Amino acid sequence: MEFFNILQSSCNDVNLDFNDKKYNQFISYKNLIQEWNKKVNLTAIVEDEEIIKKHFIDCIKIFKASPIGEAKSLIDIGTGAGFPGIPIKILREDIKITLLDSLQKRINFLNIVIGDLKLKDIQCLHGRAEDYAQEAEHRQKYDVAVSRAVANLAVLSEFCIPFVKKGGYFIAMKGPSVEEEITVATKSIEVLGGKIEDIIKIDIEDTDLKHNLVIIKKVKETEKKYPRKPGIIKKDPLK
């Protein structure tokens, strides 16, 4: 019951209900990660306790950002093994979620997870954020965009902010040192229609992990020319 108690304690910390069903979904998810990681590079974190703490607990902490608890629709960009989108869905069955990733093998894995965990109102998209953000079905259609992907904030913002409707939020899950990234990215966030509203510091219990949630509110619509063409965003981030 150790893992149940760890997960329950983390959920209590963000005022979320936790029960046997959710626990079993998390354990099934963990087992699938370990099984699939032998053939698909999903994560370098493979031990039971590390997956629970460094992936699942880290994702639960995103509920410290109030928009996660209020949103009706969410897109997780560069979701990888499903972080944080799958944990959010386990804990909030009522939210409609889209998982976006550029690697088909990871999408195959995520579809297996969705089926095995019997998750509803969740879809996977294979492709680039730059392309989907220009499609009417996805552009400025989501209450919240989230990303735990490894990229600097200026680059992530151009990938993610165009998906968010005016009045919605982009929440970036960043490492312990974000001050310099924020300084560099502030102008690009503004150009894309966003404004930094808050930075929430996160500590993961019983680990050395310290993270930051950068909360960006969409205050105006994104100009049609953004995001720019694939490849340009990383080569020439907005300044």
Curated annotation (Swiss-Prot):
Keywords: Cytoplasm, Methyltransferase, rRNA processing, S-adenosyl-L-methionine, Transferase. It comes from the Bacteria. InterPro entries: rRNA_ssu_MeTfrase_G, SAM-dependent_MTases_sf. Specifically methylates the N7 position of a guanine in 16S rRNA. NCBIfam families: rsmG_gidB. HAMAP family: 16SrRNA_methyltr_G. This is Ribosomal RNA small subunit methyltransferase G.
